[in-house]
Amino acid sequence: MDLSSEEKKKINSLRRTAQFQRSWKAIRNILTWKERVQHYFIGNMLLLFLCFIVGGGLILLLDEGILPRSDFMNGLMKHLARLVLFLVEFQILSVLFYALFGPGWEAKRRTKLRSLYEREILAPILQVLYPSAQIDTEHDMSPNHVNEVVPSAEHYIQSGILQLNDERNLQTVDLYAYSITKGKDSHDVTHFLGQVYSIKNTLPLRGELRIVPTEHFLNMETQGGYLGTMQCGKKIDVEDIKHNEHYNIYCTDEQSTRKFLSPTVIEWFNSMTSRHKLSFYSNESRIYFANYNNRYFFAAPKDKESLRTWRIEETAIQLKYAFYFANEVTEMLHKNEGFS
């Protein structure tokens, strides 16, 4: 997937605007904040080391008689000793202060970075591609509905909601779902990393329907933490063996679900198994689907290296691909016979 020549022209014009440059500089300042703090501590240590070297050298020269003892030298040594004492105390206080307040500042910095990137960088790029689109940085996609299409986890981190503002009311977010193992060597366990989409349900599909991917290990089938049967629901199979091997289907209205799962839809789901780990959920108002691809599409640079390698055209292509995938799913739904 690539950008058209017109899109490239607009994207590069956007990058040269004063507002974009100011926002990018602000992002760079946020990302280099920790590095500046490190430079501050290193500078203090170097100054302290220099004071010890100078003081030690002066004492040696005085002891050897190379420098004469005088009131001036005595005053200089006293001032140097006071400076060393001040630097030691100041360094200790700085370390304690950073230990107490640094983690809180770091969390605020990450929040500020995400909001600034989405509002000032990502949103203008998105609007070049889709003029009516916007990014909601204040709200999350409904957690109750997100849980229907991603594996269960302790923590869920969403990006801002990218809204296309079209007739489908298409919305999408980056989502990272993870848990933290307990014990001496605790670490994060990733359950989902990808995109979750939501569109208005205009299909005559009654009740709830959930389709989740399965995995096989030692002839045992698992569904990787995805939810199973919903209240007043049941698990069903279809006549297609391949589909039954790769997906579990749960619904509350079997007749409506079987009508929806036409050969066209089943064939499409089967074609996705080699390219995507797709999950699907619908109720009578909205449809949700998730693409587990182990990638962030909308995330801000996280460090100096990712800032250095960030490219505006690559970011625009990722945005286009995210909505291309949503369009692919939407087209499949509306091509299904009996649905419009």
Q: Which residue ranges define each predicted feature?
A:
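Transmembrane-cytosolic junction motif
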Residues: 65, 94-121
